[in-house]
Structure formats: C-alpha cells, structure tokens
Amino acid sequence: MAQIDSRQYRSLMRRFIARRFVVHQRMRGFVCSALPARNVLPELQGLLLLLLSSTLFADEHVNYNRQIKPVLIERCVACHGVLKQEGGLRLDTAVLAIKGGESGAAIIPGDSGASLLLNRVTATDGSERMPPEGEPLKLDQIAALRNWITQKAEAPVDEQPQRHPRDHWAFRSPTRPVVPQIEIPSAEQARWQQNPIDGFIAAEHRTHGLVAQPETDKRVWMRRVSLDLTGLSPTPEELAAFLADESPEAHNRVVTRLLDSPQYGQRWGRHWMDIWRYSDWWGLGAEVRNSQKHIWHWRDWIVDSVNSDKGYDQMLREMLAADELYPNDLDRLRATGYLARQYFIFNRTTWLDETIEHSAKAMLGLTFNCAKCHDHKYDPFSQVEYYRLRAVFEPYQIRTEMVPGELDFERDGIPRVFDAHLDVPTHLHVRGDEQNPDKSCTMHPEVPAFLSSDELKFEIESVILPTEATNPGLREFVVTTHRQAAEQQIEAARSAVKTTGLLPAEQAQLALTVAEKALLTAEAHLASIDARAFADRARHLQSALSGVSTDNNLGSNAPTIQDLAIAAAKSERILTAARADEDRARAELALVQAAADKKAEAEQKLATANTALGTAKTAIDMSSEEYTPLPGAKKTQEDYQNRNASAPFPTTSTGRRSAFAKWLTDPRHPLPARVAVNHIWMRHMGRPLVPTVFDFGRNGTPPTHPELLDWLAVEFVEHNWSMKHLHRLIVTSQAYRQSSSNAGAPDANTSVDHDNKFYWRMNPIRMEAQIVRDNLLHLAGELDVTLGGPSIPVNDETSHRRSLYFVHSHNDHQKFLSMFDDANVLDCYRRGESIVPQQALALENSPFATEMAGKIAARIAAAAPSASDAEFLRTTFVTILSVEPTAEEQVTMSELLHRMTELARIKDRPNPEILARTNLVQTLLNHNDFITIR
C-alpha cells in the first residue's frame, strides 16, 4: 500500500469534511465516488480512516511514554483505570493492557489486527466504538497505536500502575517536612541558610546541578518588593533611605512598612478578586442579570480583610456563611457577596453550577464541574456526590440590607445571602440534563467522601437566627434612617407652605392646601414609622420571652402587644388616607391649572382621587393587626418570573454552608492551605509550585517542590493562616532576592532548566493591567489612594482612583486595562501575559499616557527647577525605573534629549526643553524595564 504523509492526509481530510460532496480520490484502486456528503455511509468514512491510519508514519519508531500512554490516560483510564474497570480491563500500564479483561487481551504485541483495543477505537458502529463519549481518537493517535502494537508494544519494564486516589499527594494532609541542610560554598552559605524556603530551593539546585544566580542589586529588589506588595514603585526618597540603611534589618524594615501600608490591601485584594471572580453587576438597562448591584461592598471587605491580616481561613468562612455564623454583623455580611456574585437570573442550575465549580477551583484546587453529567474521570468524585454538594448551596438566595442613612436600595445597600427555602429538595439530573431530574431520590447535603475522615467531619446543625436577621427593620439604625427621612420630609413640607403666596390668588389657596396636606402626610408618615417600630419591638420581645401571650400586659399600664399592632396598622391606614387627601388636593390644583384641552383628563383624575380618598377614610376605622414592618432589607428576585418575591425571611437557617465552611477550613484539610500558598507563591515568584493552579487532582500537574509546598502550607496554618507572615517569608528569602538575569549563568542552567522551574534565578514578571495604570498616576503624583466606595464607571476618564475601583463586569471593561490583559470576569486563576504592539502604542500615544508623561516630567522639574539635562536624566531614570542610568545610557539619552530639543526649536514648538523632557519620559515609560518587575 502506498505511503501517505501527514500533509497529504490533512489536505485530503479538509476537502473530505468541508465540501458538500466527497472528493474523487483513488487509492490502490479504491474509489470514493462523488456522492453527496449526507449520504456517505459511516462504514465508508471508517474505511477511509482505516486505510489512512494503517499507512501513516509506518516506519517511525513509536515512543510509548510520549505517544501512547498520554492518550490512554486522557481517553481510556477514566473507565479502565484504578477508579473503574469496565469489563475487568485496565489500561493504565502496558502489562495490564496485554493481560486484558473479560473479553481477553486488549493488546497482542506484534499483531495489531488481532488486538481488541485497536478494533474498538477504529469501530464505526457507535455502540462498539471506544471511547464511547466525545470525539473518536485522532488519526495520528490511531496510527501511533497501531504501529506501537506492530512494534511489539514495547514499554518501560518498571512502569507502575496508577496509585489509589487516596494515595494521591494532594488528598493527604500536609505534614511539616524537615528543612534540607545543604552544603553551599562559604561565600553563599550565610545567605542561603537563613530562610527555610532557601533550604528547599537549594536542595533542588544540587539535585539538578544548577547554580543559583547572585543576589540582585538593592535598587532592583526595592522596586520588585514594592510593586509586589503595594503595586506602586518606590519613590526616590524611599529608595535613597533603603540604600543608606546598611543594617541587617534593612530589608525587613522595608517589608514591614509595605505590609502596613493600606496600598498593600488594594494590591493583594485585586489578586484575590481575580481568584474569586469579582464582577460588578451587568444586565439590560436596570435589570440585574448577573452578580448584584452594590457588590463593591464585597470588594471593600476583601481589601479591608487583607489589610487587617484576617486569617485566610476566616475569610473563607465569612464568604461562605457569614449569615449563619455572624447574622447581625453587617461588616462580615459583606463577605457573602462572594456567593451573591454567582447570581444568574435566567437559570438557577447555571447559578449553582458556577457556585460549585468556582468554589472548588478557588478553594479546593479541584475541578468538579464534569461530575454534573457523569462520575469524575480522574478524581474519586461521583455524580451523586456532585448533587449532594449542590444540596449544600441549594437553599440560598440573596437580599440587600439597608445601610445607615440610605432608604433607597437602588442607591446603596449590602448584597448578602441567606437560606430562603429550608426544605427545597435537590435531585440528580440524569446525564446533567436539568429537564430530566431523578425525583425518585432526594440528595442530602454532603461533602466528597474522599476528603472526609473521622477527623475531618461535615456536621450540620440548624441555626436559629436572631430577630434582627429575620426582621431587619428592628435594627436601630434602620428606624433612625426612616425617622430622619420622615423628619426631612416634614421640614420640606413646612417650607413649601411658606412659598405658596407667589401664585395667583385662586391657585395660591389651592397650592397652600396642597402644601398643608403634604405636611399632614409627612407627619402621618413619621407617626406611622414610630407606631410600626413600637409594634415590631413588642413582637420581638414577645418572641424573646416564652410564655408571654399577645394579650399579656408588659406592665400595669402598658399597652398590650395586640394594642400596639392594632395602632401600627391604624397608623398605616391613616397615612394612606393622608396621602389620598394630598393626591386629591393636587388633582384640584391641576384642574385649575390645566389648559382647556386637558380639562377632561384633569377632571377624571380628580374623580379618581376622590374615590381613593373615600375608600381610605372608610378603612381607617377597620379593626386589624396586620401592618407592614419597617423595611430593612429587600429580597432579590429569584428568577425571571420573580417568584417568592414577598416571602418573609425565615427565622432559621439550614446550617449547611456553615458546616461546609468549617469542614473546608479545618487545619487538617489537605487542600485549602496548599491552594492558597500556591497562589501567593506564584504571584511573588512568577510561576506556581503546582502549575495547574485550579487542579490539584490526579489529572493536574504534580508540584515541582512538593516538600516546600507542604512546609509552606503547614507554616501558613500554624501562623493563623496569616498572609502577611507568608509574604514576609517569601520576599526575604534568598530565592526571591536573586537576580532575574541569566547573564553569567552556567550553560547547564539553561539546558537543564530552561523554564526556570527550579528557581536558579528570579522570574521577571510583567505588570498586571491595574499596576501599569496605577504607576503612571503614581509617578505623576496624581494617584488617589482613597480606600473603598462605589465602583467608578469605565468611561470616567477624570478619575485618578486606583484601578481596582473601576466597574469590572461582563458588559463593562476599562479600555486601557483591557489592553494589558485585564482579568477575565468568568474565571481568572492565573492572568495571561501578552506582548502586542497595541500596548506600546497605548503607552506612547494614548491621551492618558501622554498626559501622565507630561505631569511626570513637570513633577521632576518642579523638584529641581535648575537641574541640568544630565541631572534631569538621572532623576528620571531613578523615578521611573528605580535605577541609575549606565554610562552608555547617559550618553545615548543625553544626545536624544539634545536632538529632541533642537527639533522642537526648528519646528518652532513652544517650550522645547519641556517638550523634549516629556518625550524622554515617554521613552522610558515604553522601556521594557518599566512594565516588567525584574
């Protein structure tokens, strides 16, 4: 049979698939005639694949570890591995494949035609083909498999089968390993033995024959650590102070100052906003479809928590269940914005799926989403367990709490979660289809069995909520806010009474009547607020004191609880009548003022107002205890139909989420500390210890430094999950203080570890989008470092706030930030890094960058008005890049500055020296060392 190379194959298949008719192609006398593609038999397609795969790359030696095993692991072992053995067959080693299962040997070395495995992966019958789900194996994979079998199915003799999932490194609780003691040349020994981190890094250097780069210049370290911890480059004054400090504690003093700075929380708060998928609300018009209005309260909680060094475990507990753990603490309730952000109005299943998927990825470092349709292919997590985990979150909904001084929930409020439906069932969706739930069985809340043990338990206890959590109107500030608004309404009404004399006589009298009625309405409103507040408090007292009935006096002359409820209800009816009377007066005035052609309409409105007033007056004397409690919170609509909109807030909560939060943050849990440490390490060191940052499972990549990861995780937990402690450890390590340059490094370093996964040098890191913009403002002296507050519209080009405060949502992106790889709102566990021409153009030509360059130049000049060009050049380098210019740079840039000045004069431009200096600043802003953290 003639050989067909890969290029011919690809060309053939493109034509075969893309065209409506099958290409006339002759191979050894076999002709695929020009039949319509829709009529091509599956057998014909399969035969074509078989003919091609049998000849493709036939003479090439097949490498089992590189070409065969990855395919078996990816496509086969989910059903034929350690977790599951369909038909008694395992394919995780060549020996087990040759041994076979119930149908016999899957592979017969040397005889591909008789090998069951090859027959099944090339089968054209859908019921026979393997794998049964997803796309068939690719042609080159089939060819490699066929040729490997023909070549006697050679594999390493020491190949080991998959270990049981319980033995997977990430599923075992970390224990503190002994720090390696490494013999290092005396000149380096002192530096590499002061920090435990360095012992682990140095051990890998020795194992792989790597030589660490020397410690970087103090200026470079100062810029590196300042940008890492606060996102802002050091000022020339800060840099000079550090250079002058020759004490052993100089580095530590800098770290302490940076960690104590409020800008630390803004910098690292943005990192966690990436991981936890922060997104402002988006929708259509005023309709919220995803996330929540005022979700910025959660963002501010993140920044505040990071600045105060709140334990990471405590942060997780508050985000998942502050409403159950701290139901009366509005400050902590902000944290549940994490769950409120998952809101999706159109589909509750999508809402909960994203809650599960991203909680697992961010907090556990595991991927659970595929288990909604079938058992997990790699980790011991079944479809049933997926829906049991969903049951943990099933009852929660969202409401917005009133904040002091604001009655309008559209203007402000704290979005938080609560368990709205305590008995809502969870059913398994057959093959993940929400339209096909299995209602024969209710899923009870549970956590994955493979992460549970006698020590690590998931125990649910129902939570009895305090009355203020059930009736937010009882909060003192809520009553105060309502009263203040009513009192302002009264003052406004009194002022209106005094201004009616300016109208014509007839209208003036009617206007006075309207103003007086409005005053009565305002006074009735205040009276109603007081009456309802009294009744609310009485009912609260009744619920707090067992044995007190509704008609039991609380004092010898005190009104009964029933009396207060009746009074509150009557006050509401009086308020309704007062408003109706005011409306009637306004209708009378409108009739007098109406034009001739509008008289009939005005008369109709007056008649309607008279009817409403009569109804309201009649209702005043009705006997009823039903009144509207003072509103202290507003429920978010649950779905597009807004069902259950008026349901009262429950008096208890299921306790499911607080049980989950406690289980998750148990110090013995194997995953959360490791996952957090990996994220923090990556953002300092430029690459993670576990490359698959959201997948620590069996399909993820193992850690490059497993002992270091475990040591850091244990250290993290034993120091109260303190992020500041971890930061200090990392940034004061010798590994962190290395040069990022490979200049002078042995050739073996780059040949053995080209990607620097063993940290023989520091990794240079490109600034994130927010840090680029913030530093332009910072260098210009224009940055507003104010903490917190509502999100800034993306089109507000006048704002100089830090970039994390811009609106960030599916619909709205700040254009400058988007240019520099801003965070993806759908998920962003690790920022992308791109280098594209548009970035340089943005720094060179955008109005924002141009304006900041001018202000940077002006600021430097103002600090030293009589500075020479050489002095200006040196100060500019130190200000923007934190380094002194080299002799070569000094000469080159001085010449450039001179030429730009002369060119500006030739073109008769105003202020040529200033223009040239501004251009010099812009040049340095486009320097790679500005946008790179070295």
Located regions from the model:
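Short metal-coordination and nucleic-acid-contact micro-motifs, chiefly zinc-binding Cys/His arrays
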Residues: 72, 363-369
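Post-cleavage N-terminal segment of exported redox proteins
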Residues: 4, 43-63, 147-181, 270, ...
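Solvent-exposed helix-loop boundary motif
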Residues: 58-150, 154-203, 207, 219-224, ...
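Globin-like tetrapyrrole-binding proteins
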Residues: 920
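C-terminal capping alpha-helices of c-type cytochrome domains
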Residues: 62-64, 133-156, 409-459, 464, ...
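Primarily short, surface-exposed interaction patches in extracytoplasmic proteins
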Residues: 191-224, 228-263, 278-320, 324, ...
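Low-complexity, intrinsically disordered or signal/transmembrane-proximal segments
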Residues: 3, 8-9, 24-25, 45
